[in-house]
Amino acid sequence: MNRNEVLREAQTILNGQRANDYGDSYDNHKRIAALWNTYLDEEYGLKPEDVAVMMILLKVARLVHKHTSDSFVDIAGYAALAEEMSSTENVIEFTLER
């Protein structure tokens, strides 16, 4: 796959069936962060965007064993989500401080 194909596929996945299956990306990552924080005794205070970054790391770990194009597609998707959620979080924090 070339870079455009990877990004198109990531966009299709993020805005298609995956969104229907798991709901809003931010809400889903927020739930995952809450579960991971509980598991880790809330020691780290993970945010939704941390989940996306950690999922990128998981995909990289898998790539060490075997190259798969879907891992690169997933990495592109998680990177886009991390940026979006990070920006959303900043807007929410700014709004709450006013």
Give the location of each predicted region:
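Intrinsically disordered, low-complexity regulatory regions
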Residues: 1-98
